[in-house]
A protein has these predicted regions:
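Short amphipathic helix-loop junctions that connect adjacent transmembrane helices
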Residues: 46, 55-78
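Juxtamembrane intracellular "pre-TM" segments in multi-pass secondary transporters
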Residues: 6-40
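A late C-terminal transmembrane helix in Major Facilitator Superfamily
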Residues: 166-190
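Pair of pore-lining "gating" transmembrane helices in MFS-fold secondary transporters
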Residues: 32-53, 142
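Helical-face signature of the major facilitator-like transporter fold
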Residues: 43, 47, 137-149, 157
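C-terminal ends and interior cores of transmembrane alpha-helices
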Residues: 114-132
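Intracellular juxtamembrane helix-capping segments at the cytosolic ends
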Residues: 150-165
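Helix-to-loop junctions at the C-terminal end of transmembrane segments
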Residues: 91-110
């Protein structure tokens, strides 16, 4: 057997009204959790800066140097993101799991948040100095993905351990994941 059974399914709703009542119960239970508004704010703010970076960095990498960009071609960007970035993301995720398992989430969450946001400093330095060295630019992108992998594990575990526990844990985790994505999407609407 490859997949876990997941337990037994709840009985199906008999009517639309019953389904609606269950949904309201799940949402009400979510917002009645102790400290939930702090958790929601934390989740949104954790990824807010990333939302800005996701919109701007591709433009910054492609823009000509004369207008403040780095003037990279599609192949270079693809290599940095698709190959080196993907490997760095996996490595960051694995190391974060190891780090958290040895120290605990409460003792590591602040450092995970710092590592998650460290790449934004690297992009600031790239914008100021506009290096031409591909290794330096690639290193900043690798740092971004490593930090993203490292920090994202912390946020995921935070949602699993602090937000999800309770009667409707799967629904509450899914709801927290949606809130997390809101933190990334809000900057796009600005």
């Amino acid at each position: 057997r490859m997949l876990p059974s997941g337990g037994t399914a709840a009985t199906g709703a008999a009517s639309g009204r019953e389904t609606w009542n269950r949904l309201v119960e799940v949402i009400r239970a979510f917002f009645q959790k102790k400290h939930i508004w702090y958790y929601v704010a934390f989740i949104i703010l954790y990824r807010l800066a990333e939302g800005f970076v996701m919109k701007i960095v591709p433009l910054f990498l492609k823009a000509e140097r004369s207008v403040g960009g780095l003037g990279l071609g599609e192949q270079e960007i693809g290599l940095y993101y698709g190959t080196y970035g993907a490997a760095a993301f996996v490595l960051g995720s694995l190391l974060a799991g190891y780090y958290i398992s040895h120290r605990g989430l409460s003792r590591t969450l602040f450092s995970l948040c710092c590592v998650f946001n460290l790449p934004f400093l690297a992009y600031t330095l790239l914008a100021i100095y506009q290096p031409e060295n591909g290794m330096l630019i690639g290193s900043a992108i690798v740092l971004e993905y490593f930090g993203y992998g490292f920090g994202f594990v912390g946020l995921t575990l935070f949602m699993m351990q602090q937000v999800a526990p309770g009667k409707h844990q799967m629904a509450h985790y899914a709801f927290a994941s949606g809130i997390m994505n809101l933190g990334v999407m809000l900057p796009g609407s600005i």
